[in-house]
Amino acid sequence: MCLNACSKKDAKQETERLVCAEADMQSFPYTEDGFNVVKHQTITPVENVPGLEVIETYFVNEGKPVTVKAYDLCRTEVEAKDTVVWSLQPSSTNARMDWVLPVTEGFAKENYLGMNNSDYGGGIPVVDLWQRDGGIAIGLFEPVLRMISMPVEWKRYGNKVSMALHYDLPEPLELATGDTLKCFKAFRYTHEGDYFNALRTFSKYMQDNGIVTMKPSEPEAFEPVWCAGGYGRPFKMNMVLGTLDKVKELGFTWVDIDDGYQIAEGDWNTNKLFPGGDKDMRHITDECHKRGLKAKLWWAPLAADPDTKLVKEHPEMLLKTDEWAHEYITWWDSWYLSPINPAVDAYTTDLLKMFLQKWNFDGLKIDGQHLNCCLPDYNEASGLESPWDAPEQMPSYFGKIYDQARAMKSDAVIQVCPCGCAVNYFLVSQINQAVASDPMSSKQVRMKRKAYAAMAPELAYYGDHIELTDGGNDFATQIGTGSVIGTKFTYPEDNPDWMEGPFKLTPEKEALIRKWMKIYKENNLARGEYLNLYTWGFDYPEAHVIRQNNALYYAFYVDPVAPEGAMDPAHVDAATVPVPSYKGTLELRGLDPAKIYTAIEYTADEPREFEVNGANPTIEVNFERNYLLKVIEK
């Protein structure tokens, strides 16, 4: 442990900065123009975690008053050894960007963890840079998500990539003589490999120190999912009921009733498409249960349409911004409800009783990018000590949902889908099923899976609808990474009143589902242990390994390249994208050099077996899109 007041000779190594109204202080003690601000810092190596340091910083004003507007922690520069440095930048915007990004010359990204667009905010308070020989991560060890930025930049004509933890104070803070400014608790971690190691170490520290408690998933959370979303919002009850036998026949266990049953966001009773009201919803769950299926209900809490009965009768539930306006949710054309508000809590409890008891659903599919974060809440009815308690404590709202739902149904599966967002880390501890959350590509399914496996190894991860993967059929991405499989096929026809699709279960799609369902159930990789044996960005092809049933399951992937100007391969005509392929050598890491193994191409239509020597674990391959391999001791 080291406690010191930094002197002038340390200025070149300075990693903190104070942005003040009077000066930009970048070396300490700062003694210019009559100021005297001293930095004190404790740097504590964490026992038994090589490379991890906990950093606690505070500033003492020993001179004339100074007004602090912002501060930086852990400012770090990495010398680029190649033309690209890979990074974890888990912040959220409406661009729905990859969490993992290549950083090249000219790159700059702010990574603010508060609200960046009307619906988008939140993330993970960790930023990581790595190269072939290892990486360095910085972040916060705080009890809630602080609204910091994590800027990453590679300035043109240089060879340094910088990152920092930047905090803009909500209001300028005047430090009088003798006052102290205590900063957020930060960390720095040097590591081998990629972002998996950074997130695993961060999350393990958070759990070991009682800051968060991750919830292990029960067997039900790993069962395959069919979602009625393929029928769209104007779906009818008979469409769902008419599909159940086929759902059962194909091996799915969960039936997710999607958006469209409700009067409006906020008024969650059934609309005119369900004239029987509560009886119709109960009939759906009864028909599911009769077939041995489970039913999960889609729900977008904390959203209320302006013309709803809820808004008219309970304005005290609405979040108010610093301008005393309602916070708007663009996607739903709704307003935010206050997440930390006693009236909202009571309203939510009543809804849970309707969903899980009266309607008898077995779980919840909680959905919407707005669930990841919100603006500060100035609603006096919320009773907050600070308006910033709303975004910081927002995940606790979902913790209450989880606890109440599990009290009503002890094996309820609670999924939160922050669509397109980098998940709010503090949400992860309030659920028992994570989700790929509207992935833009197969690659996003895989990179998110790796992140969740690092943060919460026992948490089920649903790979979302297969229709959202490249080509709409990439079961290899879901199964090879240990994800729960799912689909939103329609049967026997699409909904003529819904323009999206087609999602119709064709003979070809049915054959594909039957093949991969058998593989999914026989190997049970979703319940296996994810091993971090390959480095994202530097090992090619992209590789993942799952340990399950005394076997190692390898999965290798090459991604399509979209035509110039296309947003993403998953959202262009497959005919215009060349099928990606790889021909060359693969190294099977993690094998014992003293043993001989049998390798099985377990997803091939005609599985091939061959021998692998652990002392020389390389094989020659030639494949398109993916190559999945099961390796067992001989």
Language model features with spans:
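Catalytic domains of carbohydrate-active enzymes, especially glycoside hydrolases
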Residues: 239-261, 358-360
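Glycine-rich, aromatic-flanked loop segments that form ligand/cofactor-binding clefts
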Residues: 193-212, 227, 254-256, 277-330, ...
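Active-site-adjacent "subsite" loops/lids of carbohydrate-active enzymes
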Residues: 216, 221-225, 232-234, 297-358, ...
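Active-site-proximal substrate-binding groove within the catalytic cores of carbohydrate-active enzymes
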Residues: 179, 183, 398-607, 618, ...
